[in-house]
Amino acid sequence: MARYTGPAWKLSRRLGISLSETGKELAKRPYAPGQHGNGRKKISEYDLQLQAKQALRHMYGVNEKQFRRIFNDAGKMPGIHGENFMFLLESRLDNLVYRFGLARTRRGARQLVNHGHITVDGSRVDIASYRVKPGQVIAVREKSKNVKAIAEALEVAPATKDFVSFDAEKLEGTFVRLPERAELNDQIKEQLIVEYYSR
């Protein structure tokens, strides 16, 4: 399945969740495009599972093949499958660049990585799906520190999560540790995703 490239606000309204995690997309119209409000149609269990999967997949901007591979990797880890799945998504390089506030969206963060603006432990990494390990340092390359999009993103960046640290002067941050479930989006129902793939 191809990666969605349309307006994020429209997809957020269709899925009923803020994909940017800011809530702005749903502030005025918290219902699907084309509707005048929430309908009374009964939603099946399968539809709920599919919607949960699509919401998480689009939130992190991952195509179906990558999404399923990460899900399978999470199943090999000790602990709760659904939570481990979210932790692995959080450890993607593009997501951490977004968490640092270096880009306004995960899509923008992915472009920064793909265009070679980011290093991990001093080495340039241009693979957005690169899985960062706790303790690794992510930084903007010296020659990329004047990129306008980065400066603009930092001006409106929200506070960083406790599982990362970021130095705005040096434009570098550390993936301190894996997050705890309570630190991540509580609108995501990862157990429904586990059920979807267990059908």
Curated annotation (Swiss-Prot):
Entry-linked CDD domains: S4
Subunit description: Part of the 30S ribosomal subunit. Contacts protein S5. The interaction surface between S4 and S5 is involved in control of translational fidelity.
NCBIfam families, per database record: PRK05327.1 (NF003717), rpsD_bact (TIGR01017)
Any GO CC annotation of this UniProt entry: small ribosomal subunit
Name used for this protein in its record: Small ribosomal subunit protein uS4
Domain of life where this protein originates: Bacteria
Record-stated family: Belongs to the universal ribosomal protein uS4 family.
Reported function: One of the primary rRNA binding proteins, it binds directly to 16S rRNA where it nucleates assembly of the body of the 30S subunit.
Entry's Gene Ontology molecular function annotations: rRNA binding; structural constituent of ribosome
The keyword RNA-binding is assigned to this record: yes
Keyword list, A-Z: Ribonucleoprotein, Ribosomal protein, RNA-binding, rRNA-binding
Domain S4 RNA-binding: 91-151
